[in-house]
Amino acid sequence: MAKVPDLFEDLKNCFSENEEYSSAIDHLSLNQKSFYDASYEPLHEDCMNKVVSLSTSETSVSPNLTFQENVVAVTASGKILKKRRLSLNQPITDVDLETNVSDPEEGIIKPRSVPYTFQRNMRYKYLRIIKQEFTLNDALNQSLVRDTSDQYLRAAPLQNLGDAVKFDMGVYMTSEDSILPVTLRISQTPLFVSAQNEDEPVLLKEMPETPRIITDSESDILFFWETQGNKNYFKSAANPQLFIATKPEHLVHMARGLPSMTDFQIS
């Protein structure tokens, strides 16, 4: 089965996108007077269990800090925590302090998968056709053929393999080395396979010509081609949790996995 985006990959992206955090804190420690350099008066009894402003015997300029974004961390036991990130924009207010005291166990967050289009603003540049006039067979050895409506595809057992739909595969270039974006066009036609929502049939979308540049808004005709042995998977670029799939008595559609079959053989 092809791999799908997991939580820890999302966390790695989160940290890599915010790697300037540590350098910002280092800069702060070198250029600001230490918070602990100042001496403070003991608290009176009537200040216990309250949020108070600490008075200092020295006059110092407090660094301007604000809560800006969340930094996600995972403990050794697998517990996911949310910690606040500091930046040099606005001063901390008493409201912020009150929030911290009243909510000491702030923000245990649930694992979630970030949508692909949220993480990236991708552009895909056309390179060339890498496969021509090939057929796709599913795990039941059924070939993909055009439905009677001519708008959809379906899987069917064929005696004459010449009746199977033949595809051309165009490959696109992107900055991501770990993915191989491709289009599936019915050979000698302007019809491209177009991904839809989960459990919805894929459409045959007419394009006047092969797109030279594809952006996120047009990524329904783009798929990430993955292989495992002789099995081939086509993951939607518009929704990477969905694959081109077949199921008995159903049109070719988009699915996450079983009971639909998402692997194909190319011949």
Curated annotation (Swiss-Prot):
UniProt cross-references to SMART domains, sorted A to Z: IL1 (SM00125)
Tagged with keyword Acetylation: yes
Gene3D superfamilies for this protein: 2.80.10.50
GO BP field: cellular response to heat; cellular response to lipopolysaccharide; connective tissue replacement involved in inflammatory response wound healing; cytokine-mediated signaling pathway; ectopic germ cell programmed cell death; extrinsic apoptotic signaling pathway in absence of ligand; fever generation; immune response
Disulfides per UniProt: none
Cellular localization per UniProt: Nucleus; Cytoplasm; Secreted
MF-aspect GO terms: copper ion binding; cytokine activity; interleukin-1 receptor binding
InterPro entries in the cross-refs: IL-1_alpha, IL-1_CS, IL-1_fam, IL-1_propep, IL1/FGF
Residues bearing carbohydrate: 64, 100, 141
CDD domains, sorted: beta-trefoil_IL1A
Residues that bear N6-acetyllysine: 82
Entry keywords, A to Z: Acetylation, Cytokine, Cytoplasm, Glycoprotein, Inflammatory response, Mitogen, Nucleus, Phosphoprotein, Pyrogen, Secreted
Subunit field text: Monomer. Interacts with TMED10; the interaction mediates the translocation from the cytoplasm into the ERGIC (endoplasmic reticulum-Golgi intermediate compartment) and thereby secretion. Interacts with IL1R1. Interacts with S100A13; this interaction is the first step in the export of IL1A, followed by direct translocation of this complex across the plasma membrane.
Comment text on domains: The similarity among the IL-1 precursors suggests that the amino ends of these proteins serve some as yet undefined function.
UniProt name for this protein: Interleukin-1 alpha
